[in-house]
């Protein structure tokens, strides 16, 4: 009788546990959304995750110039930077801000995390830290290091996973579920630095198009019931990449978006940010008059620098221009 009572108690506890079990799912269509979520403007569609080439444009310059001189362009020089918006730059197909990527039970609140790391298993995309720039890792181009900053936490990406707990202000919730939209995930500050070390690299030609498919950083979502729940803060991405790629919603990459040009360069060391030219009547200009304002620019060039705006695979051509941001003046000049 005692045995039967304990058995019954055990079976009852199983039912209680099953009834309170919570879990998250990846949302790929509207069938996972409640009427309340749909009425609130939330949507859903299939998404493929952080595949190597499924990345967007971070907003970096299309051409990044690298000097072969360690004195003209010393270690730590910022070569380029951009802010990657998760909605538009983390995947090849942009997300809408209200596109739901995951659905969790309301009991999961407090257990939901954004996880982020560098590509810790790729030698040229986030595996090896360089001591020359804090938080930066060797990149595919020789003498270049990349540093990524999570703009929600202010922390640098690392090959060792970091986490950010999601809170109710970043999701939609009804009486049964929590819906995690794309807007819940963080943007990134992406920086590229010149370094002296040549320890890890794949490219070193006078001109290299970045065709390295490996992303430099990843964002994953961790919640109960998902395989990504096994990712813990502090684990090494080199061996712990549970749920990649289909359960990771985004990645940061420069694949097919930048070209590295190496050679003798020039740099501007002194210049005014804005030059204001006094207004002048159209009639005066038509009669041959003009309006002037003096300004000074200091330009320093390396030996061998080539002055040209033409593309080249044999030299890092340099050119300087001036931007006129007054639309009327620009239109008149083009007539």
Where are these regions (language model features)?
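Hydrophobic helical h-region of N-terminal Sec-dependent signal peptides
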Residues: 9-16
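Surface-exposed beta-loop interaction hotspot
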Residues: 260-284
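N-terminal export/ancillary region detector
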Residues: 23-267
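Bacterial N-terminal signal peptides that target proteins for export
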Residues: 1-8
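Short, solvent-exposed loop/turn segments enriched in Ser/Thr/Gly
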Residues: 289-295
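N-terminal signal peptide c-region/cleavage motif recognized by signal peptidases
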Residues: 17-22
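Outer-membrane beta-barrel proteins
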Residues: 301-307
């Amino acid at each position: 009788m005692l045995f039967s009572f304990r058995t019954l108690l055990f079976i009852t506890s199983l039912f209680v546990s099953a009834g309170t079990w919570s879990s998250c799912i990846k949302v790929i269509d509207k069938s996972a959304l409640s009427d309340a979520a749909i009425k609130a403007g939330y949507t859903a569609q299939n998404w493929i995750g952080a595949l190597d080439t499924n990345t967007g444009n971070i907003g970096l310059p299309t051409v990044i110039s690298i000097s072969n001189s360690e004195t003209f362009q010393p270690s730590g020089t910022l070569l380029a930077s951009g802010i990657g918006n998760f909605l538009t730059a983390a995947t090849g197909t942009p997300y809408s801000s209200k596109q739901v990527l995951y659905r969790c039970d309301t009991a999961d609140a407090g257990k939901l995390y954004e996880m982020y790391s560098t590509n810790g298993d790729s030698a040229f995309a986030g595996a090896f830290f360089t001591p020359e720039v804090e938080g930066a890792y060797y990149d595919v181009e020789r003498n270049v290091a990349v540093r990524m900053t999570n703009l929600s936490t202010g922390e640098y990406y690392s090959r060792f996973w970091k986490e950010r707990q999601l809170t109710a202000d970043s999701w939609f919730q009804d009486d049964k579920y929590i819906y995690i939209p794309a807007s819940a995930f963080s943007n990134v500050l992406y920086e590229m630095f010149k370094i002296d070390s040549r320890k890890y690299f794949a490219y070193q030609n006078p001109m290299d198009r970045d065709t390295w498919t490996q992303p430099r950083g990843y964002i994953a979502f961790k919640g109960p019931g998902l395989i990504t729940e096994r990712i813990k803060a502090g684990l090494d991405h080199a061996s712990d990449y549970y749920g990649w790629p289909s359960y990771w919603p985004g990645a940061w990459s420069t694949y097919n978006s930048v070209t590295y040009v190496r050679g003798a360069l020039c740099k501007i060391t002194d210049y005014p940010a804005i030059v204001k030219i006094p207004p002048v009547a159209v009639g005066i200009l038509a009669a041959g008059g003009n309006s002037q304002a003096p300004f000074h620019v200091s330009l320093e060039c390396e030996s061998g620098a080539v002055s040209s705006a033409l593309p080249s695979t044999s030299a890092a051509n340099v050119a300087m221009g001036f931007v006129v941001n007054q639309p009327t003046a620009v239109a008149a000049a083009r007539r």
